[in-house]
Amino acid sequence: MGPPWSQESSPEERLPTEWSRQLTRARWVLLAVLLCGLLLGSSMLWFYIFRNCGPCPCETPVCMELLDHYLASGNRSVAPCTDFFSFACEKANGTSDSFQALTEENKSRLWRLLEAPGSWHLGSGEEKAFQFYNSCMDTDAIEASGSGPLIQIIEELGGWNITGNWTSLDFNQNLRLLMSQYGHFPFFRAYLRPHPAPPHTPIIQIDQPEFDILLQQEQEQKVYAQILREYVTYLNRLGTLLGSNPQEAQQHASWSIVFTSRLFQFLRPQQQQQAQDKLFHVVTIDELQEMAPAIDWLSCLQAIFTPMSLNSSQTLVVHDLDYLRNMSQLVEEGLLNHRESIQSYMILGLVDTLSPALDTKFQEARRELIQELRKLKERPPLPAYPRWMKCVEQTGAFFEPTLAALFVREAFGPSIQSAAMELFAEIKDAVIIRLKKLSWISEETQKEALNKLAQLQVEMGAPKRAVKPDIATQEYNDIQLGPSFLQSFLSCVRSLRARNVQSFLQPFPYHRWQKSPWEVNAYYSISDHMVVFPAGLLQPPFFHPGYPRAVNFGAAGSIMAHELLHIFYQLLLPGGCPACDTHVLQEALLCLERHYAAFPLPSISSFNGSHTLLENAADIGGVAIAFQAYSKRIVEHTGELTLPNLDLSPYQLFFRSYAQVMCRGLSSQDPQDPHSPPSLRVHGPLSNTPDFAKHFHCPRGTLLNPSARCKLW
């Protein structure tokens, strides 16, 4: 007899067990149905949320203003996949210029601040700035003074045959006065700048003078004679304004232009000097005295850079030694045989330099010259600027710390600065991620690059010194305003030069911004290892805390990423990264050059792809990095906004905002600009960004979705 658990059960005894199993199966089926229903319901709920509660339209006043700006500047009838530049920038009356429009808006803001009534402490920086501005705007007083204040200055320089008796003074004495007291540098320029080589300590640098007739393109050589004739006409007009008869004025103008032409023949293009390794010469004052003896270098430089203590063993950086040698020989020859020609050249040049502070007759003569030169060079005429804009620019040049403080208080408050710094931090993090993924960079170079990025300084809004009114007041103690506007102007010129010298004499010289805080231009300073983003740039339509994040990342974020990539530009130069995979790097750079060369350009463009290569690389990398940062942000944070009535998703709005920054007419571009023409600054980076084609659904093979792309950053 077996064990009890082995006994068989009858059919009747097995019935409850089978019923129990069927019931369990039914329960599982019911549970599965319920779970499927729950999942389906959840999916529908999430679909509803994302469809109806996804990106919300931003309808605040700042967003509606931005919307109006976008609608007015773009041409929505253009297919974005074939011409995104026109889609974003081509308004009905021509291509809009975002940088120029914002620049003018910032100046208008300064104008309103300077026109507003206020009471200032006696002798404060604000009081002197407002007094100078009001003096500049007092055109009745300037017209009443006429050429009297200018003739008085000419008499201090020994006079001139045109304005009265001429007493031939010591040449170097006159030259010292011209440069140190009146800001006119007829034969060379001298300035303090960081040394071009590390550790970038401040050093006096000597460079060519600036000429109105400087030729930049081969086509200008054909109209050289016409340019000279226009310049003679201008100088002749200056002479008659100073009281000369037409024949005498013509003679002095001819003498001056002959001397100018001979100096001009000694100039060499910067690219040529660089190719011949002649752009930087380190010499002592003594050595320069031997090479160019017509100039008393020690006394002249001492006068310019007072209160610096100089001696004959002081080192200088000379940028064109051959020019200085030839200039010295020409001056010596002129002092022996054509002394009056040199005096005419120096005096007429001084009048030209001081024309912004003279009455309208002098300013109109200057303006007509510029317009004629632009016409001969096939460039569009300059628009007529109102008097208030000129006075704002002059006040800003001389009283920058004071106007910077006013502008920042008005346009770049703590909340805006905090939002801008937060954006910069996210862009910087995206750059770090990029550096870690580069295929052509070595591990050692990667560590160096990351360390360099970690040590980077950043300044936003305005220099820290600029917002301290007590410092500004001390800096303006030496300014004496009046009795004439010309005298006020010259007092400010001398004060500004003295402040520049003093800043370099500090034990730890602070970084002097290369741009005013209201300017629309960011930059990277190699000598200070610092990126600077002025308050004037971080304004609508480029940036605002209340904008959709897509706008801020696409516009300001791309600019920030662009400047951060300039930190590593040396890696892209030949021999700049010996530890890198140079084959992969060079292939990427060649790809980039071919990529830009493939785009059609208007016939008026003189684009040189190799000349703009580094900026093109920063443009392409800047957009990619900013988009990477934005994509990360949109995943990690909810509540995305977009602009109504544009029919653009947040990702599409990112690219639209980037293009908006680049809106500019081709004719407004400087021939020496290291950037590509505006349309290429849009099409080049966006066509190299697969996400653009993805989000705008561009068919393969269209302009903005090419079959091949370049991989650099």
Swiss-Prot record:
Q: Which residues form the Peptidase M13 domain?
A: 57-713
| GO CC, one annotated term | membrane
Which residues participate directly in catalysis?
E563, D619 (proton donor)
| PTM annotation, UniProt | N-glycosylated.
- Write the record's keywords in alphabetical order, separated by commas: Cell membrane, Disulfide bond, Glycoprotein, Hydrolase, Membrane, Metal-binding, Metalloprotease, Protease, Signal-anchor, Transmembrane, Transmembrane helix, Zinc
Q: Which cofactor does it need?
A: Zn(2+)
> In this UniProt entry, which residues form the Extracellular topological domain(s)?
49-713
Q: SUPFAM superfamilies, per this entry?
A: Metalloproteases ('zincins'), catalytic domain
The GO molecular function terms of this record are: endopeptidase activity; metal ion binding; metalloendopeptidase activity; metallopeptidase activity
Please name the CDD domains in this protein's record: M13
Cellular compartments annotated: Cell membrane
Enzyme type, top EC level: hydrolase
Mainly localized where?
A: membrane
**InterPro entries, A to Z:** MetalloPept_cat_dom_sf, Peptidase_M13, Peptidase_M13_C, Peptidase_M13_dom_2, Peptidase_M13_N
**Note on cofactor:** Binds 1 zinc ion per subunit.
Task: Offer one example of a GO biological process linked to this entry.
Answer: establishment of localization in cell
Q: How does it assemble?
A: Heterodimer with XK; disulfide-linked.
What's the protein called, per UniProt? Kell blood group glycoprotein homolog
Q: What is the gene name?
A: Kel
